């Protein structure tokens, strides 16, 4: 399954870019690979750099015409030059007991901006990746929870089934410094099983696409903590037909 922003591997012959990768094993060769929006990527040094199941920000160079990639379909991966930059912390997905969006959570903080990057990969190997920007102190620690009430049916927006999710961020440890500044963090959320279920349901209905509308708390009135304003970011997925 892929988001509508996912890239077509074969539109370009040589690719140099940054992206998200989820470490795993090739089903055909059992070699360590990074699953990306360009497919599974392999490099001989990967096994010493990554941990199975972990998410990473990577830089890579991929030549689709190289001899190593002549048998990519047989191998189950593309060979690339890969530099692993950072491991990405995983957020917590919750599909039940969704808190009331009209009330603040304990130590909840607003999100200035939320977005994803199609070139990096919006949805990769079961994980939804987001760039999240907030005003916070250096070294401040936060918890990131993505709520999705699966008991609720989707709404229809411009003839597209749209599911509401809620990203909520709470401070869990103070940072340092005299003033807060705008800081961005990346988080990955594993929603594979639920997304596959939604895809199957939408395929049975004859849908060709569906949206995930991620709502996030954008501002809190300093004089009235019950005055909350929400913004949203929408990710669109193409429906894969049931086999």
Segments from the language model and where they lie:
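Surface-exposed beta-loop interaction hotspot
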Residues: 68-135
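Short beta-strand elements
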Residues: 223-243
């Amino acid at each position: 399954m892929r988001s509508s922003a996912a890239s077509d591997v074969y539109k370009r012959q040589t690719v140099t870019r940054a992206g998200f990768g989820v470490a795993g094993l090739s089903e055909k060769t059992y070699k360590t690979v990074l699953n990306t929006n360009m497919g599974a990527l392999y490099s001989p040094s990967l096994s010493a750099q990554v941990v199975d199941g972990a998410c990473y920000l990577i830089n890579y160079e991929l030549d689709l015409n190289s001899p190593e990639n002549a048998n990519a379909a047989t191998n189950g991966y593309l060979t690339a030059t890969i530099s692993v930059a950072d491991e990405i912390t995983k957020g917590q997905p919750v599909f039940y007991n969704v808190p009331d969006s009209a009330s603040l959570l304990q130590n909840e903080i607003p999100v200035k901006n939320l977005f994803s990057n199609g070139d990096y990969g919006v949805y990769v190997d079961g994980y939804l990746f987001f760039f999240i920007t907030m005003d916070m102190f250096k070294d401040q620690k936060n918890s990131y929870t993505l709520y999705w009430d699966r008991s609720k049916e989707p709404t229809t927006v411009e003839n597209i089934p749209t599911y509401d999710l809620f990203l909520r961020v709470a401070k869990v440890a103070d940072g340092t410094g005299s003033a807060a500044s705008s800081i961005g963090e990346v988080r990955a959320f594993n929603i594979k099983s639920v997304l596959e279920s939604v895809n199957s349901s939408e395929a049975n209905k004859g849908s060709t696409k569906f949206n995930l509308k991620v709502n996030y708390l954008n501002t809190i009135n300093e004089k009235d903590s019950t005055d909350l304003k929400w913004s949203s970011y929408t990710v669109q997925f193409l429906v894969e037909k049931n086999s």
